Amino acid sequence: MTDVVPDSNAPAYSVSELAFALKRTLETSYAFVRLRGELSKVTHHGNGHVYLTIKDDKSAIDGVVWKGNVRGLGIRPEHGLEVIVTGKITTYPAGSRYQIVIETMEAAGVGALLAQLERLKAKLNAEGLFAPDRKRPLPSMPAVVGVITSPTGAVIRDILHRIRDRWPCQVLVWPCVVQGDAAAGQVSAAIRGFNALTPGGPVPRPDILIVARGGGSVEDLWAFNDEGLARTVAEGTIPLISAVGHETDTTLIDFVSDRRAPTPTAAAEMATPVLAELRALVSDYDRRLNNCGGRAVEERRTRLTSAARGLPRPADLLALAQQRLDLAVRGLPRLDDLTAPAERRFKEAAARLDTALQRNTDIHARDLLKVTARLSPDTLHRQRADAGRRVGDLGRRLDLAARRVPERVAQHARLPALQDRLNAVARRRLERETDRLAGLEKLRQSLNPTRPLELGFALVHKADGGIARSASELASGERVRLQFRQGDRDAVIDGESSGVLPPSAAPAPTRPTPRPKPASSSDQGSLF
């Protein structure tokens, strides 16, 4: 028979009440705990939190690093890393599990740090960040040098002093901390800031960068082993020299940078040339160039002198030809003596021709003015107006006759036809006047003194300048000048004159046959 437990007065907890009571007890009793162990099951969540497990050879405890504390850890949580963490113990009521909320984390000894560094080096090397072919050459003569270091201390003074002694250039210093949890982030920001500068902007873009820090322990230099900083150096486009610690100190940034310097002073020497050495080198090149050029010029001058000795003198080559030319010139008459008579005759003929042409031009101009006056448009308009008035008078007379002779109504019906005939008469009169005007225009053209020349005729000028109008005026052998439309020619009269036809023998000019007048219609009535 089962024993019956008597009723108790103790209160009964709900599950939630018990879970939260245990949570308060743990958080109160273990509000600050320093825990050492090995990290495992490290998970970097997308929301920024880090979930992990801390274990030893016998036990394990879950842990979490909230997003706000991840950047302040100083190291990156990785699987297998032995660390010392600080935080508080709490529970997760939904699963009845306890865990530690981590606030700080540090490597448990130098050996752990070096082991983490070796793993990170192997990872980055496998990605090709240490490959020699991605190293950029340093500029030979930089105009701007960017220095990333602490603004105080001996490092920046040594760099500035060394650059000032060697090379005149502008130095831009980006101050940042070089030790502690914030060092890696500030150095990365400085590298990205220098690379973001645009060439030709208000702030000059450096040609080369120097990341420098003095010596220290492994923990002091640990910020330069940060994976994010190493990737920032690899992504930059400006050549970078790392000068962290002493010659025996090696950090992760040394493998990614384009050049490693054992000391900050050595970094300044790598970044800049020596101005005095460059001047000496340029002077030596200039001296060697001048010597080489002088020898080449002297050698060519010697060859040219030797070649010139074998050539004859120009005066000797031209002496015989010059002598023959002088003899030929003495035997020629003077050009002025040959051309003077012809020039005198030409001037006299030109004067006579000008006088004759002017006289003929004046005569023809007066004739042309008379013809033009008769053919002016005003005259033609007056004649046309007179014809119009006569036609109007005839019309009025026809109207008067029609009114006076009522009995001739039948004839009055033919008045439109008569009007048409009168208009035809006026048109014929106008055509005759137009033909007459065309004939006068032809006459005017024929009176143009240069018209015969355009038709192929020529003017014959005698020796005294006058124009020959008859063959009897010219004697055989007499020299004359023929004037054509384009140019003149000299000629000599040959043969005897055959005379001219008498007026009776000349063909009589034919007069154009007048056109017959149209026969008057038989049915045309009398106007009166």
From Swiss-Prot:
PANTHER family: EXODEOXYRIBONUCLEASE 7 LARGE SUBUNIT (PTHR30008:SF0). Its main location: cytoplasm. Coiled coil: none annotated. Keywords: Cytoplasm, Exonuclease, Hydrolase, Nuclease. GO terms for biological process: DNA catabolic process. GO terms for cellular component: cytoplasm; exodeoxyribonuclease VII complex. It comes from the Bacteria. It comes from Caulobacter sp. (strain K31). This is Exodeoxyribonuclease 7 large subunit. InterPro entries: Exonuc_VII_L (IPR003753), Exonuc_VII_lsu_C (IPR020579), OB-fold_nuc-bd_dom (IPR025824). It is an enzyme of class 3 (hydrolase). Belongs to the XseA family.
